[in-house]
């Protein structure tokens, strides 16, 4: 008796196994895999000196990153197997889970302090960063809200303000860690989703003005944030003090010139540039691969983010509005984090502790990025094969024989 293993591992139709084989958005997948591969190479180079001192093995950080990468690819596959309708039904539970994680991380004895911030929950040798999970859960919840309350959001102030009953307490928990960067990224993505959801221009403008005012107050409320802002305007005035990290990052860009000094030949990673393998991995990349390599990396990021937005548009055309909002929201998270990290590295923004998606060393960020990729691939597949995300009963006949639009 033969056993069809596809029926064991595939409770629902999925882009992994279909009647035509693997049916994925290969341009999106290729772009993200290219970034992941580049990230692995740069982590191997940028972390070698730190790893040698901390563990005696120059490949220690690379091995850990590779483990996170394998876990992340597994998370990507799992999210591709789950129907988008399931995420929509679980929106409230995810929101509660996000609040629970953010509360846990600030509790003494549970949260783990690193560099003066309580942003991690320790599980043995590994740390989990709840803010990375919370940002995605907020996107999923808000996408469901925009679908349920579409008319209310577009026509009334109450529909506009209701999401902030959830968003503001969550932002407060993030600021208690403190994690100002994650707060800005999350609130920025939420604001963009509300705008796409049909919030009037006047209400959106008011929201932006209030957000700018809030950021101004938050910067002035904490001396270290104010110091970073002052240093950012002229880092060379205190290049061995508060401006040290930024000046070393700029030196890395200067050393790289057009074609770079070559892979593995960075000088700045040798304890001159702090966090060379995490927040400032792009500076090491610029030093080793030069302006040309940096621009190619930026082009890859632009392609991936634009492709994510197009996936949202395709879902919207297929009238799968929840999936469309999720795709938009995830893309905005990537765009926000990418712009802030690159801006910090090149000196256009004050120093902020945000990783570069797909490239920086960090298990939580890498796994969540891969899971988001899985969601986007699932959304693209469902919109292309016209699998409904509301009341669909799955069967083998749901597999489309031909794509309904070319991409």
Curated annotation (Swiss-Prot):
Localization in the cell: Cell inner membrane
A Pfam family matched in the record: FTSW_RODA_SPOVE
Membrane topology, from the record: Multi-pass membrane protein
InterPro entries: Cell_cycle_FtsW-rel_CS, FtsW, FtsW/RodA
Catalytic activity: [GlcNAc-(1->4)-Mur2Ac(oyl-L-Ala-gamma-D-Glu-L-Lys-D-Ala-D-Ala)](n)-di-trans,octa-cis-undecaprenyl diphosphate + beta-D-GlcNAc-(1->4)-Mur2Ac(oyl-L-Ala-gamma-D-Glu-L-Lys-D-Ala-D-Ala)-di-trans,octa-cis-undecaprenyl diphosphate = [GlcNAc-(1->4)-Mur2Ac(oyl-L-Ala-gamma-D-Glu-L-Lys-D-Ala-D-Ala)](n+1)-di-trans,octa-cis-undecaprenyl diphosphate + di-trans,octa-cis-undecaprenyl diphosphate + H(+)
Topological region Cytoplasmic: 1-25, 87-89, 141-155, 203, 305-321, 377-407
This protein's GO CC annotations: cell division site; plasma membrane
Class in the EC hierarchy, top level: transferase
E.C. numbers: 2.4.99.28
Residues exposed to the Periplasmic side: 47-65, 111-119, 177-181, 225-283, 343-355
Record's keyword terms, sorted: Cell cycle, Cell division, Cell inner membrane, Cell membrane, Cell shape, Cell wall biogenesis/degradation, Glycosyltransferase, Membrane, Peptidoglycan synthesis, Transferase, Transmembrane, Transmembrane helix
GO biological process terms held by the UniProt record: cell wall organization; FtsZ-dependent cytokinesis; peptidoglycan biosynthetic process; regulation of cell shape
Molecular functions (GO terms): lipid-linked peptidoglycan transporter activity; peptidoglycan glycosyltransferase activity
Family: Belongs to the SEDS family. FtsW subfamily.
Name assigned to this protein: Probable peptidoglycan glycosyltransferase FtsW
Gene: ftsW
